[in-house]
Every structure is written in C-alpha cells, then in structure tokens.
C-alpha cells in the first residue's frame, strides 16, 4: 500500500503534534496578510482560501471538502470571487496569496454557487420525505441557503442501481453527488481500498466495482461524512427523525479506548449511536461495534430478579426475596469463603461498592476476568498497566513496536491513529506476533516471545532502530499477558522500554512503555485494588461467589464446590447468568451515570439516556441495598457520596477527562528483574485475528442481531444476509 502524498498546509492533515510549540517570532515572520470581504486576516503560507475565510468566521458552503480528508475539489460548491481575478476559484483547493481580497458574498460568487447547486439537483431525486438523511442533510440546508428559488430542469433524471456493501450501510446511489468523501475516508482513514468510482460524466458511479461487503471495522463513519442520503444506516432505516430524538452525551464501553458518543433515544429506546468529537481520543470517528451493537441493549435482558427453585430452575421473584436470600448467605459465610469476579463492562462505582461490601465480611478476594501479571511491580505501579504515551501521543512517535496485539480489532480508533501517523509523519511500525492486516505496512519481526529478550539484549537488528528513535513507543497487548508466561513477557517488555529510555535520544517527559487493554473496566478495577485473573479463586474455591457482570466464561461450575452459592448481577442473560443461584438485574451503560477509565488512564462518565428495563437497577444501588439487609451497611446513599468514596480510594477516578502522569518506569523495571524470565516457545497470537472476531466480544454485542448479521456477511458474503424489502 502506497502512502498518500499530503499537502502539509491543509488543516486536519498536518496539525502540529500535541506538545510541539512553534516560536511566536518565527511564526509571525512567515504570516501573510489577506482580506476576507475587506476584513484583514494573517495566515500562514499555503493556507487555502476556505481556511482563511473560516478564520474570520465566514462559512463557505462545501460538499466534498472535509477537514480530516485530502482535498478533492469535486463539488465546486465552494466557489468564491477573488478581487481582480478573471474567474471564481475553488476555495478548498486554492492557496491564498499576499494581498488577496476574497469576496464571499459578491454577485459573482452567488451566481456561481446557484449554478453549481442547479447542476447537483438536476439528477437528484426528490426523496426528502422518505430519506433518512432528512433534517440533517447538507444538500437540503445548502440548497435553501445558496440555491436558486426555481428550477429550469425539464428532462428525466438519471437512475443508479443500489449497491449491497453489507448489513450496516444502506446505499441509495441515485442520491449520490460524487463528492468522493466515502472513497477518501476508506482509503485514507480506514485503510481499505474497497470503494472507488466507475464510469465518467453522467455515468459515473461510486461503489465496490465487484459487488462485495465493505470490509472495515470503521465502515459506519461513511454514513456521517456523506453529505446527502446516498449512504445511511441500515439498522436505523425509517425508525426516527433527528428532531424527534433526545440526544445524550456519553462514553462507549465496547473497548478500552473510551470513545465519546452521542446516544439518540426516543420513547425510552436507543435509536442510534453517533460519534462525539474528542481530539485526544476518537477525533470524530467510532467503530462499527460502538455504532451498531445498540440493538443488543434490548435483547436477552435481565429485567426481574430470579432465584433457583427446588427443581433447579430459575424463576422470577421480588427484589425483597432475592436480596434477603443473598443477604442470608452473606451472613453465613465470611473471609475466604466469599469471593467476587468483576466483568468487562462494570463501572467504577459498582466496583468500589462491591469492594467495600466484601471487605465488610472480611474478604479481599476481588478478581477481574482479565489476567495481568502481579509478579514484580505487577499492578502496584500505575505506569505498569497504562497506555502511558496516550492515544493522541502516537502522532508524535517516530517508531512503534507492537507486541502480541492486533490493534485494528482490539482498539480500532487507536489503530486509526497509528495509520494517520504512518501516512502523514512517516512513522515506522514493527510487529511481534501473528501477521495481521493492520491497514499500514510494518516490519514483521516474528511471532516468538523470545524476540523480546533478543531486542532487550541488543542482539536483534531492530534494537538499533529503537536506539536511534527520538520518540519510540512499545505497545504490549493485554491479550499477550493471558498466557502462563505473561509475567516473563511483561518483564522482557519492561526491560526493552527502560533500555530505550537510557540509550536512545528520548526526552525526560516522553513515555515509552504502553499496555493496550481490550475491556472497559480493567484499568478502574486495577486502580481500586482488584486482583487480575481468577487463579486465586481456582486455588481456594469459595462457598459464595459474586459475579458482577462476569460473562467471559473464565470460571465454571466445575471449578467450584458443588454447594457453592453463586450470585450473578448484570444486565444480560449471557454466560454468567445461567450458572447462578440468584440473578440481580443491573443497568447497562446507556442507563446509568457511571465512571469508566480508558486504557490511557483517563476517567470519563456515561450519562443516563434511557431508564433500565423492567425492575433492573443501577449496580451500586443494588449492592448498597444488599449491604443494608445483610447488616453491613455501606456509608453512602447518593451517587455523589459514592464518588467521594472513589476519590478516597483512588483520586484519579474522579478527575474526569484528565490523565495523571505515571513516572515509575525505572522502579517497575528493577522489580521485573525478580520475575521468572522463562518464556514459552508458543507464538504470540491475539484473540481477534480477523474482522469476524471483532463483532461479538461481550454480552451486549453477542445479543445484537446486527453484529450477528455482520459475522454472517463476513463468513458467507453480503448476499447471504436477507434484508427487508424497503425503499
């Protein structure tokens, strides 16, 4: 795959990396003066006319231009007049020159836009009443603002056959205006060259040439950037209008990136999920699982408490009965006879409440499903388990070493950042692990974990590359630590990071060592002192086990005593609920105000978008009620009080949208030398090798029919998925 040459002057494609500050004197000396409707503005050389206009607050209409994509200049809607110039110019593609006076609202500019709009509408169908883009359509808005008030077109309009590009994106290509935003997104951001144009003139069409599924984990973003109704959401088709929905700003929990989202709801139901801008995390993109798995929120839900009767069947009961049974068992067992496992979608408030409850019955056996080595520094030092360079920090790096991970499917937005830096900043990438398609070229160093020791000792050729790097990153996937030699892998990895800091030109504030987590709850659980992995429970099986959203299948009935009493608290009847003796229905992430900490250690909040179904309640409230009935009342009654408790245990958990610097790398490396360094010969194989492994990874996405359709389409082809006959 060839790298795309990029004009460095374009905003969005060449933003200065975070932390890099240009001196004021140098910048000021390079500025040139131009005028926008007579108003003076100082801009850098190479700035386009459109960017200069935006700098003074003048909005120029556009369809093909997008801040994060290369310039195409297809639509011509941004035509403006330059004083004394013979013709109007395309503002998105024309760099300004000193002394230019740009006339955005002159008669010449208006006539040019009206002409362009008339040509765009000549073949555009009058579908607005049935188009899902209605109400948020750029063509609607701009035709009202900049178009003519009458039509001169009397001939027939062209018709284009719709394309089937999978179960997520609905295509009505007669509406397409050939802006090529989707093509540029696929090629530049997603790194998948599936979309392109065929034909020319009136016969030009956008599609996949050979009809096939648009195979990308970021494919849904072409819906957002399409300025018309040519590309819309299949699951959302004909369900709601944008002005009918209530929008709630929230956080995604489908992975550990913590993408910012907007949850659109109507009549107590999630209608769709859209991205929300956050430059340091997801920019303005989200993954397909984040966007489309929401239908899993209304399927296989636990809506009422359940208990197992004398026949061994789970039956519905009241909250009073369920909590009384659990409280009675809590009063019967103490200490090591009580244990808990937290799942991947649990919020920090529920984690601290469960921790306090078990501590009050003299138990500290609190585990997570995900394993993380505790030998050496383990989880005692926060820098040992965070993505310390930060997600946005990838854009500053010059070398990235990926170990035992497939970031394309484990953390799609992190992978998109790597691709962005590879494309624009000549980033060099290397991989230790199974060869996978990462949407960018990389040096495959092998799949043996022993390569880590070779790099650490300096005997591997890539050691020299890391030594010469100014801002290197080494990224270890948490999936590589699930192995029996996870501690040795982490020790070797830590040794590489520390050696780079000592021998290369790394500055003091640059972080080299990074752990890429896969699940949303892991960092908060480690911050609160949970033990990673369930080995402690397997060695000393408890008499009472509390499963808090634990649906990873990390423990079964066979691992526990026959008389072990199991409580499951969660929102889906997935893996954990069927083995439980009592089920307490909890709330999903769209139904509660909760705290999650992403892989870089950034605390963020979800907000209540809809109420929990049936009798389900927020997790921390259930645990608080249980503690009162059990006679070990927890000292908080409100959400604010729970968060005060969070602050007592780990202050960073309530410093929202902030990253606390972690600086104990040298100490962690010294402690790692005490670890058994024996590595296994087994190759490093990430669990999500292909896109088929990406779609269904947790209880919500496994309950989603849309995600099931995606798996079927990938396996059998897009034609295998039957879609309802709709317009």
Swiss-Prot record:
The 4Fe-4S His(Cys)3-ligated-type domain, residue ranges: 108-147
GO BP, sorted A to Z: cellular respiration; mitochondrial electron transport, NADH to ubiquinone; mitochondrial respiratory chain complex I assembly
Domain 4Fe-4S Mo/W bis-MGD-type: 245-301
Name of the molecule in the record: NADH-ubiquinone oxidoreductase 75 kDa subunit, mitochondrial
Statement: the UniProt record of this protein carries the keyword Hydrolase: no
Residues given in the record as [2Fe-2S] cluster binding sites: 64, 75, 78, 92
PROSITE patterns in alphabetical order: 2FE2S_FER_2, 4FE4S_HC3, 4FE4S_MOW_BIS_MGD, COMPLEX1_75K_1, COMPLEX1_75K_2, COMPLEX1_75K_3
Protein residues bound to [4Fe-4S] cluster 2: 176, 179, 182, 226
Listed cofactors: [2Fe-2S] cluster; [4Fe-4S] cluster
Keywords assigned: 2Fe-2S, 4Fe-4S, Acetylation, Electron transport, Iron, Iron-sulfur, Membrane, Metal-binding, Mitochondrion, Mitochondrion inner membrane, NAD, Oxidoreductase, Respiratory chain, Transit peptide, Translocase, Transport, Ubiquinone
Family annotation (InterPro entries): 2Fe-2S_ferredoxin-like_sf, 2Fe-2S_ferredoxin-type, Mopterin_OxRdtase, Mopterin_OxRdtase_4Fe-4S_dom, NADH_UbQ_OxRdtase_75kDa_su_CS, NADH_UbQ_OxRdtase_ferredoxin, NADH_UbQ_OxRdtase_Gsu, NADH_UbQ_OxRdtase_Gsu_4Fe4S-bd
Membrane topology reported for the UniProt record: Peripheral membrane protein
Positions contributing to [4Fe-4S] cluster 1 binding: 124, 128, 131, 137
Catalytic reaction list: a ubiquinone + NADH + 5 H(+)(in) = a ubiquinol + NAD(+) + 4 H(+)(out)
Domain of life, source organism: Eukaryota
Any one GO cellular component localisation term in the record: mitochondrion
Enzyme Commission number(s) of this protein: 7.1.1.2
């Amino acid at each position: 795959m060839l790298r795309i040459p990029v004009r460095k002057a374009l905003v969005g494609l060449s933003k200065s990396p975070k932390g890099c500050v240009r001196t004021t004197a140098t910048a000021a000396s390079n500025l040139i003066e131009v005028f926008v409707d007579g108003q003076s503005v100082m801009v850098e050389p190479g700035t386009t006319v459109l960017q200069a206009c935006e700098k003074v607050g003048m909005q120029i209409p556009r369809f093909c231009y997008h801040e994060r994509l290369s310039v195409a200049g297809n639509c011509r809607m941004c035509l403006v007049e330059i004083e004394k110039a013979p013709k109007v110019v395309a503002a998105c593609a024309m760099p300004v020159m000193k002394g230019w006076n740009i006339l955005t609202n002159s008669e010449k500019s208006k006539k040019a836009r009206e002409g362009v709009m008339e040509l765009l509408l000549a073949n555009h169908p009058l579908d607005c009443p049935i188009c899902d883009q209605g109400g948020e359509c750029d063509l609607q808005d701009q035709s009202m603002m900049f178009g003519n008030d009458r039509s001169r077109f009397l001939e027939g309009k062209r018709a284009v056959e719709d394309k089937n590009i999978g179960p997520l994106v609905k295509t009505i290509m007669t509406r397409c205006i050939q802006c090529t935003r989707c093509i540029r997104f696929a090629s530049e951001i997603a790194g998948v060259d599936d979309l392109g144009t065929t034909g020319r003139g009136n016969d030009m069409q956008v599609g996949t040439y050979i009809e096939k599924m648009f195979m990308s984990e970021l494919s849904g973003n072409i819906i957002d950037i399409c300025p018309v109704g040519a590309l819309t959401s299949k699951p959302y088709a004909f369900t709601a209008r944008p002005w009918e929905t209530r929008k709630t700003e929230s956080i995604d929990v489908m992975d550990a990136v913590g993408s910012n989202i907007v949850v659109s709801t109507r009549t107590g139901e999630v209608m769709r999920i859209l991205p929300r801008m956050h430059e340091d995390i997801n920019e303005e993109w989200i993954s397909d699982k984040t966007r489309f798995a929401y239908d899993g929120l209304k399927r296989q839900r636990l809506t009422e408490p359940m208990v197992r009767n004398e026949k061994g069947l789970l039956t519905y009961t009241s909250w009073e009965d369920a909590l009384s049974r659990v409280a009675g068992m809590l009063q019967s067992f103490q200490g090591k006879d009580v244990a808990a496992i937290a799942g991947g979608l649990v919020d920090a408030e529920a984690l601290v409440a469960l921790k306090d409850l078990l501590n009050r019955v003299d138990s500290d056996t609190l585990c997570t499903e995900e394993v993380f080595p505790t030998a050496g520094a383990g989880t005692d030092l926060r820098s040992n388990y965070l993505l310390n360079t930060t997600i946005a920090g990838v854009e500053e790096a010059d070398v990235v070493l990926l170990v035992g991970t497939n970031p394309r499917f484990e953390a799609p937005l992190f992978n998109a950042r790597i691709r962005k830096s590879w494309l624009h900043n000549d980033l060099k990438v290397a991989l230790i692990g199974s060869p996978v398609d990462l949407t960018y070229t990389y040096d495959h160093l092998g799949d043996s974990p022993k390569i880590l020791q070779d790099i650490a000792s300096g005997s591997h050729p890539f050691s020299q590359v890391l030594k010469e790097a100014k801002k290197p990153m080494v990224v270890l996937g948490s999936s590589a630590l699930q192995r029996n030699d996870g501690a040795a892998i982490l020790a070797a990895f830590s040794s590489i990071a520390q050696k780079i800091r000592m021998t290369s030109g790394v500055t003091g504030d640059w972080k080299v060592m990074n752990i890429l987590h896969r699940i949303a709850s892991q960092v908060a659980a480690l911050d609160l002192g949970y033990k990673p992995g369930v080995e402690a429970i397997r060695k000393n099986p408890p008499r009472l086990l509390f499963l808090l959203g634990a649906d990873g299948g990390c423990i079964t009935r066979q691992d526990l005593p026959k008389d072990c009493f199991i409580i499951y608290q969660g929102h889906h009847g997935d893996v954990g609920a069927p083995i439980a003796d009592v089920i307490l229905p909890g709330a999903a992430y769209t139904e509660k105000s909760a705290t999650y900490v992403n892989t870089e250690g950034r605390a963020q909040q979800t907000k209540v978008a809809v109420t929990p179904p049936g009798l389900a309640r927020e997790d921390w409230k259930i645990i608080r009620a249980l503690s009162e009935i059990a006679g070990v009342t927890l000292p908080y009654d409100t959400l604010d009080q729970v968060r005060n408790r969070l602050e007592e245990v780990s202050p960073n958990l309530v410093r929202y949208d902030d990253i606390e610097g972690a600086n104990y790398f040298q100490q962690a490396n010294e402690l790692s030398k005490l670890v058994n360094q024996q590595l296994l010969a087994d190759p490093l194989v990430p669990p999500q090798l292909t896109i088929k492994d990406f779609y269904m990874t947790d209880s919500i996405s496994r309950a989603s029919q849309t995600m099931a359709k995606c798996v079927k389409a990938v396996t059998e082809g897009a034609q295998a998925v039957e879609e309802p006959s709709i317009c």
